[in-house]
Amino acid sequence: MDDVNSIVLAAGQAAEEGGTNNFLVPNGTFFFVLAIFLVVLAVIGTFVVPPILKVLRERDAMVAKTLADNKKSAEQFAAAQADYEKAMAEARVQASSYRDNARAEGRKVVEDARAHAEQEVASTLQQANEQLKRERDAVELDLRANVGAMSATLANRIVGVDVTTPAAAG
């Protein structure tokens, strides 16, 4: 370091003694600044750049891993969505089948109830017809049995003569 100082001082004295002051010609200051620059560059290149590069590489690796995870997640989501759609389609088909079966069973129950009601109506009508026939037969027998007495009573009321006596009969 002592040599550098002496060079700088010598260059400064030479300039004062009447040397040319051309800034394009390198002097001792230039070499001293160049040496300091190279030392600082070496220190930065040795101690600063490698940790920064390491952090940047780790960040790039993390970004790449995140992208891969996102892609994998998207594929898993697409597969799950496809499975969901497939399951929903199967469920819709099964629900449609259950609904159709329920409708068919409902129609069958309604038809059975209708047939049972028609059968009850037919038996009720048959019983009513039989009862009416029995009552008609009973009324007919009663009328046949009482027709003579009723006609005599009617003739008595209309004619005013007792037609039930044996003299009127002859």
From Swiss-Prot:
GO terms for cellular component: plasma membrane; proton-transporting ATP synthase complex. One of its GO terms (molecular function) is proton-transporting ATP synthase activity, rotational mechanism. The chain crosses the membrane at residues 30-50. The keyword Chaperone does not apply. InterPro entries: ATP_synth_B-like_membr_sf (IPR028987), ATP_synth_b/b'su_bac/chlpt (IPR002146), ATP_synthase_B_chain (IPR050059). It is found in: Cell membrane. It comes from the Bacteria. Its main location: membrane. It is a single-pass membrane protein. Keywords: ATP synthesis, Cell membrane, CF(0), Hydrogen ion transport, Ion transport, Membrane, Transmembrane, Transmembrane helix, Transport. F-type ATPases have 2 components, F(1) - the catalytic core - and F(0) - the membrane proton channel. F(1) has five subunits: alpha(3), beta(3), gamma(1), delta(1), epsilon(1). F(0) has three main subunits: a(1), b(2) and c(10-14). The alpha and beta chains form an alternating ring which encloses part of the gamma chain. F(1) is attached to F(0) by a central stalk formed by the gamma and epsilon chains, while a peripheral stalk is formed by the delta and b chains. Belongs to the ATPase B chain family. HAMAP family: ATP_synth_b_bprime. F(1)F(0) ATP synthase produces ATP from ADP in the presence of a proton or sodium gradient. F-type ATPases consist of two structural domains, F(1) containing the extramembraneous catalytic core and F(0) containing the membrane proton channel, linked together by a central stalk and a peripheral stalk. During catalysis, ATP synthesis in the catalytic domain of F(1) is coupled via a rotary mechanism of the central stalk subunits to proton translocation. Component of the F(0) channel, it forms part of the peripheral stalk, linking F(1) to F(0). NCBIfam families: PRK05759.1-3. This is ATP synthase subunit b. It comes from Mycobacterium marinum (strain ATCC BAA-535 / M). The gene is atpF.
